[in-house]
Amino acid sequence: MKPSTAFMAIADYLEGEKSSPIRHEYLGGQIFAMSGGSEDHNRIALNIASWLKFHLRGSGCKTFIADMKVNISIAQRTADLFYYPDVMVTCDPQDTEKFYKRYPCLIVEVLSPSTESLDRREKWLNYQTLPSLQEYILVSQSAMKVEIYRLDAGGNWSLEILEADDLLVLNSVGLTLTIAEIYDEILLP
């Protein structure tokens, strides 16, 4: 991602994103252009989103893929952030904004070489400030490997690393997937 050098107001950012051919993430007044994803990146995200959409039909929960922003307000830094998660689920009736969501319970990022460190550090640190978030998932494109961070009843995050023969149990939405379902039609080396 390449940063813009000018400070931008949130309202201007949101308005500009409606017509921009390139998506941008917003970090406290600066915007960063996003690169496109690979075919495998898109297919993995679509596989996960499809299972979620089907499972959650009629539940009041909503599944979003790639083009829906998540808004994070960080009071101690008096900054607003807007990211585009690869997949996101919100079940909160307060989440009524048309172009971004504030209360996701589940966020999925498919790892790319150009964004992996961002997904693992900056985004993860900021996503943890979302009081509604229960699970954060990182999915590899280069191997059948899924990492899931879960929030427990005591407010602590734990990490589980899953591989080819494991099951991904999504407590936040009551869905269990095989790792093979996530990587359906993906040819790995």
What is the role of each PLM region?
Residues 1-189:
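Gly/Pro/Ser/Thr-rich low-complexity, intrinsically disordered segments predominantly at protein N-termini
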